Amino acid sequence: MFTLLITGTDTDAGKTVLTTALAAYWRTYFPSQSVALLKPLQSGVGDRELYRELFALNQPPEEINPLYFQAPLAPPLAAELEQRSIDLSLPWQTLVKLRQSYDRVLVEGVGGLGSPITWELTVADLARDWGLATLLVVPVKLGAIGQAVANVALARQAGVNLKGIVLNCVQPRSETEIAQWAPADLITNLTQIPVLGVLPYLGDRTNLAQLAAAAAQLDLEAFLSA
């Protein structure tokens, strides 16, 4: 059984793209291995609906996303608007159940690694407390190097088991832009965390074949054997 948390440097770093790409990859190339998707907390409409549309999951909505809040805000603020508390035991119990039933469980975090999930805890704290191997998505843009270094420092401070970095083209990028804005060798040298590759810009993020092909270009073998 394999469990992986996908987090990012920020809200729009590309967590959902990487999560769906990995799910498409394993379902395409390893069809005998079952894959479950989990979004422990969600604020606003988004990932759980996309997951069900893309993969025709047998998982009920409350299993994909145990804690849902209507307002597209940080979870503690969204929960406050609804006069609700955030009980992390519910998504934890869901994760335990999924681990018992599926070969692979992909967990998508909310916001960025430093984003709050309660008034006291961040995504980094959740990754540590749940003992999750973690991938960090860094968008390819000016400032990507500094974002990567800062988030890896946060991961180390929090005790996160950070396994790798994936660079993601949130907009069409040339090879020159990628090399100058998010040089993999420099990021690896500064963080001592391997960069597993670059996800290209995907205009159609519902094309399973394209998603699987994009994930296939990542150095997943090195990551899985680490």
Curated annotation (Swiss-Prot):
Mg(2+) binds at residues 16, 47, 108. The active site is at residue 39. The keyword Repeat does not apply. It is found in: Cytoplasm. SUPFAM superfamilies: P-loop containing nucleoside triphosphate hydrolases. It is an enzyme of class 6 (ligase). Belongs to the dethiobiotin synthetase family. Catalyzes a mechanistically unusual reaction, the ATP-dependent insertion of CO2 between the N7 and N8 nitrogen atoms of 7,8-diaminopelargonic acid (DAPA, also called 7,8-diammoniononanoate) to form a ureido ring. This cyanobacterium does not encode bioA (which catalyzes the formation of the precursor for this reaction in the cannonical pathway), instead it encodes bioU, which replaces bioA and also performs the first half of the cannonical BioD reaction. Thus in this organism BioD has a different substrate. GO terms for molecular function: ATP binding; dethiobiotin synthase activity; magnesium ion binding. Its cofactor is Mg(2+). GO terms for cellular component: cytosol. This is ATP-dependent dethiobiotin synthetase BioD. Pathway: Cofactor biosynthesis; biotin biosynthesis; biotin from 7,8-diaminononanoate: step 1/2.
